[in-house]
Amino acid sequence: MSTNSESNARTMIGKVVSDKMDKTIVVMIERTVKHPKYGKIMKRRTKLHAHDENQVCRVGNTVKIRESRPLSKTKSWVLVEVIS
């Protein structure tokens, strides 16, 4: 049952911008969107808090995170792997 819910969970790839909290990292996700009227391609950024159990991430690392149940008020993502 848990494998089915894990396969449906969203995953994102982003860059670590903060690792100052215990077992928590802040990951910036950057995406491009097209303006609906003018058609200009714009960058949009989202910061997500993710759980880093073993505290292996450092600022500047590229990581993959997966959506999970809420772990705190702002944290509902879990670190899957460090890409670089």
From Swiss-Prot:
Gene Ontology cellular component list: cytosolic small ribosomal subunit
Keywords annotated in UniProt: Ribonucleoprotein, Ribosomal protein, RNA-binding, rRNA-binding
This protein's record includes keyword Ribonucleoprotein: yes
GO biological process, one term: translation
Example GO molecular function: structural constituent of ribosome
Keyword Zinc (UniProt): no
Function statement: One of the primary rRNA binding proteins, it binds specifically to the 5'-end of 16S ribosomal RNA.
Protein name in UniProt: Small ribosomal subunit protein uS17
